[in-house]
Amino acid sequence: IVQEVSNDYAVGLAKFFKEAFIKLTGDENSIVEIANYQTGDKDFSAILTNIKAKNPDAIFAPGNFTESALLVKQARQLGIEAPFMGGDTWETQEFIDVGGKDVEGVALSTAFDREKATTPEAKKFLDEYVKEYKGEPSALTAMAYDAYLIAIDGIKRAGSTDTVKIRDAIAATKDLECVTGMTTLDKNGDPIKGAVIKTVKDGKFTFLDFVEAK
């Protein structure tokens, strides 16, 4: 794991990945290295030299797009061939522009891809968006629309303009058809749903797989 310690989102993803991976493998030592860097860093040679010596099967590095692209690029220059995995912050054109051919084949998790636009709500959203904006919606756009759907559904179920009732109704969201899939909110307000896995192929983000939530 290579984490951007000044980025709370990246640190959170690294924490959840570590916990899930150790649980999945049943091996407390399955994570061979946890390396840290700061936002804005550009030279990762020291980190990567240490990682190369550990010879990992894969590297999870959920940081910002620029730093992550440089990290992957420098890893390839050092001869590290292990696959890289990241989060949705990688899904920007800048990541591909900075990383170039070196980011081909990486894997990243995100929330939306047109190939998984399987619900009627998703198909409706995709058709209307493309018609209006002449382009593909990003995962952030899809999630923003989901937030709208969740809020509207909560208001309808609350049957009131009382803010507490609306809040409680939203918190109780269960099996709501959204753009990114059927959505249920847990006790923390986080959505329980699957994740889209993408890769970079021929300089473009490409659908790879879909992982159901368990």
Each model region followed by its residue ranges:
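Short, surface-exposed alpha-helical segments at coil->helix boundaries
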Residues: 10-18, 119, 123, 194
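Hydrophobic alpha-helical
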Residues: 42-49, 54-78
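Structural motif
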Residues: 33-50, 120-121
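Periplasmic-binding protein-like
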Residues: 1-4, 55-64, 71, 82-87, ...
